Regions:
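Helix-biased detector of long, well-ordered alpha-helical tracts
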Residues: 1-138
């Protein structure tokens, strides 16, 4: 983490319906928790998920964290393309990852523009849908 998440959480928090930092459960584990607690599903665009420099290279040579297998085994509600070389990164635990937030569609561009104004990297990585708690990775 290069910057404190205090300011970014205040900006996002004004409009978010759910927000968490990505830590030991990886982005998939935290997103699944939001889905379960909210009673919704989500379509996640794997190509929109930011990846740290060097992370994909490590994945390609088979480097995995000690929690990787456990995170994968607990994600039975996740449908992901196993032929995409990036999928293992979704289960990678972090000790201090970025923030993951659910923002109503009407507020998305307001929030993303405000984050850009202050120099915060941000991406729209998916969309929630009414339905059972599941993650569909595309």
């Amino acid at each position: 983490m290069m910057r404190s998440q205090g300011q970014i959480s205040r900006i996002i928090g004004q409009n978010a319906t759910a927000m968490t930092d990505i830590t030991g459960f990886g982005i998939i584990g935290h997103l699944m928790k939001i889905c379960r607690e909210s009673g919704v599903g989500v379509t996640l665009s794997l190509d929109q998920v930011p990846i740290l420099k060097g992370a994909l290279d490590l994945t390609l040579i088979g480097v995995r964290s000690t929690l990787f297998e456990e995170n994968v085994s607990q994600s039975f509600e996740v449908k992901y393309p196993k032929d995409n070389i990036k999928w293992p990164l979704l289960f990678d635990p972090q000790t201090s990852g970025g923030l993951l937030a659910a923002i109503p569609e009407k507020d998305v561009y307001l929030v993303t523009n405000e984050l850009k104004k202050y120099g915060f990297m941000n991406e729209i990585i998916g969309e929630f849908f009414a339905g059972p708690p599941e993650i569909r990775v595309t």
